[in-house]
Amino acid sequence: MTERTEAIPESTPEVASNSARSTLCYPYPAPPAPGSTLEIAPGVRWLRMPLPWALDHINVWLVDDAEGCAVVDTGARTEAATAVWRATFPQGGEAHTAFRVTRVLVTHMHPDHVGMAGWLTRAFDCRLWMTRTEYFNCRVAAADTGREAPADALDFYRRAGWSESAIDVYRARFGRFGQHIHALPESFRRLQDG
């Protein structure tokens, strides 16, 4: 005698997404409110920075050090991000703001991570810490701001099989990187392995 079993329905992305989401366990019931921080470990504070895109926020970190606190990642160059930084470090604000910002560390050159780095380093008279590759790639991308997409790049993408509509999107977005970042400082402290 064989036992009869029901067929397992095929998994769809929606089913997979919902089941994965229902099994996630978050250590905090809610993110910090704009301009507020949440201490997630001794000396490590979580700050949520708004973004004007589909991904509507980035997590940035304030890490206490011997002389104040280091900022890890910065948010994109927007009025909302500037307002959050001003609310986070007001004159005579919360107890942790008595520390000065000692450095700004940027993990990589995407505008949501590096966008406010130049503003923060000037506002707090501190150094930017970044890898050499990311720093110089950021400077190169910013230098293209306002330029049209190069013909050789358009030819490359056509040869790679891009449709004309995809080329049009690339052309429309090219040269906008610098709009999302404050100018980087002329020097930086190099982060490297080891």
Cite the ranges covered by each PLM segment:
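Conserved beta-strand hairpin/beta-sheet module of binuclear metal-dependent hydrolase folds
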Residues: 34-96, 126
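Accessory terminal helices/loops
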Residues: 1-36, 142-168, 176-177
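Intrinsic structural disorder
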Residues: 1-7, 43, 107, 126, ...
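Active-site HxH/HxHxD metal-binding segment of metal-dependent hydrolases
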Residues: 80-83, 87-193
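Short, flexible loop segments at the rims of nucleotide/cofactor-binding pockets, characterized by
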Residues: 23-24, 46-52, 104-107
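Glycine-centered flexibility sites
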Residues: 43, 75, 115-116, 194
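A short, structure-level motif marking secondary-structure boundaries and short turns
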Residues: 20-21, 71, 101-103
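Residue-level marker for the onset of beta-strands and adjacent loop->beta junctions
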Residues: 33-34, 57-59, 187, 192-194
